[in-house]
From Swiss-Prot:
Statement: the UniProt record of this protein carries the keyword Translocase: no
Single GO MF descriptor: carbon-oxygen lyase activity
Gene: murQ
Species of origin: Porphyromonas gingivalis (strain ATCC BAA-308 / W83)
Signal peptide, first to last residue: none
One Pfam match: GKRP_SIS_N
Catalytic activity, reaction form: N-acetyl-D-muramate 6-phosphate + H2O = N-acetyl-D-glucosamine 6-phosphate + (R)-lactate
UniProt cross-references to InterPro entries, sorted A to Z: Etherase_MurQ (IPR005488), Glucokinase_regulatory_CS (IPR005486), MURQ/GCKR (IPR040190), SIS_dom (IPR001347), SIS_dom_sf (IPR046348)
Active site per the UniProt annotation: E80, E111
Protein name: N-acetylmuramic acid 6-phosphate etherase
Record GO biological process: amino sugar catabolic process; N-acetylmuramic acid catabolic process; peptidoglycan turnover
């Protein structure tokens, strides 16, 4: 039975009468519940990830879809895949109701359009090798529900992340993830605990997939894009550690090849010094 936990009254009241310290401690107390709630969903996350990996190994893509905070978190996670793991920006794609304008400002009624989500997926050439994950704390967002319903009808793997039990969105997902974090500190403000849970789960999904696809070596981002001085320094220190090089030699090697992984492979192919 569908239960709208995200709209239940807060466990706290008369918030406007509290001190700053009391508010902060209350929020932190509630946030500590999120990690435990996420831990209970690990079997659900595993089931979804294990089905995504073989699809992506064969060239399939991953789509995140959401509105408001949920959509922004999907776009955020997708945007981190190229710099962190060196994958093309078309590998994981985040779609938000209302388009890029909605990343900064609310777009009136964009999330209420049931057809628009599927139309956007079609514009990206979505097909049965891809996966679509809908993100909606309430599990009732029409933009996301409509997209998942059509995706599933076309034989596309579907998953979802929501914070209510047996929601309409979960009914459209092959692999639903229901992370129940309880009432929000500010009643109905699902950008809080529900949003935190979504971010944690998205991190787990994308990171576990990238590791399983060989984009991490040991515990290091050997395929990261060298897009700023901080990352060049990080890559340099990786090579220093692996091959006992000076900072200058490691940096020169890294910049020559433009990739930690390729630089490392080049060193391993060199004949040993006599």
């Amino acid at each position: 039975m569908f239960e709208k936990i995200t709209e239940q009254p807060s466990l706290y009241d008369r918030l406007e009468e509290k001190s700053t310290r009391e508010i902060l401690e209350d929020i932190n107390r509630e946030d500590r519940k999120v990690a435990e709630a996420v831990s209970r969903t690990i079997p659900m996350i595993e089931r979804l990830v294990e089905q995504i990996i073989p699809r992506m190994e064969q060239g399939g893509r991953l789509f995140y879809m959401g509105a408001g905070t949920s959509g922004r978190l999907g776009v955020l996670d997708a945007s981190e895949i190229p710099p962190t793991f060196g994958m093309p920006p078309t590998f994981v794609i985040g779609l938000i109701a209302g388009g890029d304008r909605a990343l900064r400002n609310p777009v009136e009624k964009a999330e209420d359009n049931t057809e628009r989500g599927w139309e956007e997926l079609l514009s990206h050439g979505v097909n049965s090798s891809d996966t679509v994950i809908g993100i909606a704390a309430s599990g009732t967002t029409p933009y996301v529900i409509g997209a998942l319903r059509e995706a599933r009808r076309h034989g596309i793997l579907t998953g979802c992340i929501c914070s209510n039990i047996e929601s309409p969105l979960a009914a459209e997902a092959d692999c639903p993830i229901e992370v129940i974090v309880g009432p929000e500190y500010v009643t109905g403000s699902s950008r809080m605990k529900s949003g935190t849970a979504q971010k944690m789960i998205l991190n787990m999904i994308s990171t576990s997939i990238m590791i399983r696809l060989g984009r991490v070596k040991g515990n290091r981002m050997v395929n990261m894009q060298l897009s700023n001085n901080k990352l060049i320094d990080r890559g340099t220190r990786m090579l220093m550690s692996e091959f006992d090089l000076s900072y200058e030699d490691a940096r020169t090697l890294l910049l020559r090849y433009g990739s930690v992984r390729i630089a490392s492979e080049s060193m391993k192919q060199k004949p040993p010094k006599k």
